[in-house]
Amino acid sequence: SRGEQLEAHEILKAQMMAKFGADQEMAQKFARIWDACAEFDKPVSSQFKMRRKRADDFQERERIFGWHFTNYSFHNIYDDIDFYQNERRKLSDILGKKINEKNIEVEKDFGDYTQVIDFPTFLLHVLAIWEGKDTNEVQLDDKKLLALFDIKNKNKTWIIEFSEFLLKIKHIFDNYIVRNSNMDSSSRNKDEWFLQKGTYYEYQPNGKAKEHYIVEERFTKNTFSDSEINKNIILLQSMFAVTFTANRDSRWLYEIFQFLFRHIEELNDQEFGAHFKEFLEKMAVTYAEERLFTEDRRIKKYGAIPVYAFNFVDYVLWKNR
């Protein structure tokens, strides 16, 4: 039919929703998860309602991501998502890009930023992690999105489990992968690479002791409390991002995803930042060796030296400043 043509990831969403049949509750909850992840320029946690006062009952966000939004190992999250029984949504709304905002509170302080990949490529990364692919096996051509997912051979249980996994990886992505700021703000400058995470805050309005504590999730605090480690990780990740700019060249990111997923239970540990930095430095050296030297271990001549080598040297000079 005439009109706007659906993108491949929207068709994929429709194929998955079809697996729920007449089960409107599960279909609606699936759509909530998918839409939250597809709002790619916003932290996924911000797309779920949270309590406004400390004395209130936990809402979706706390139930899924934990009190301080640091839970990455959640399971059975369909039980934690609200179902709006009388909600009526047009098919265009369900398949479209805008999440239903009447049931969520949207923070304003996460700013405007650009991710290192787009949503279709992210889906391919998540699928490959889900299937346990090695780095050399992962396919990142978004034209193959529908074929790689092969939904006709998947059942409802697979869709539910994959959507939970998708949300898990998006939450990790939001907090542990660099982004590039599109605007100046109190916590970052335009065009600056940054690594910040959602953080729990509570305060009493106007500093009055008798007032209820207001609670918020703010997105302006560095992911790692050690500023030197946070800066190192930003420089290492951004070095890969500015070298391999095409979505289909983001295997470097897949290696990082694999590492983060393997260490999902350690992400909140105090020493994890140093462990993560060490992993990235070893990865950077490996990439440099593969690109700086010929097969007989000689340094490549000027015309054959790839861009990555210059970016790597910049990092080494910064570290040894």
What label would you give each PLM region?
Residues 1-321:
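Flexible coil/loop and intrinsically disordered segments
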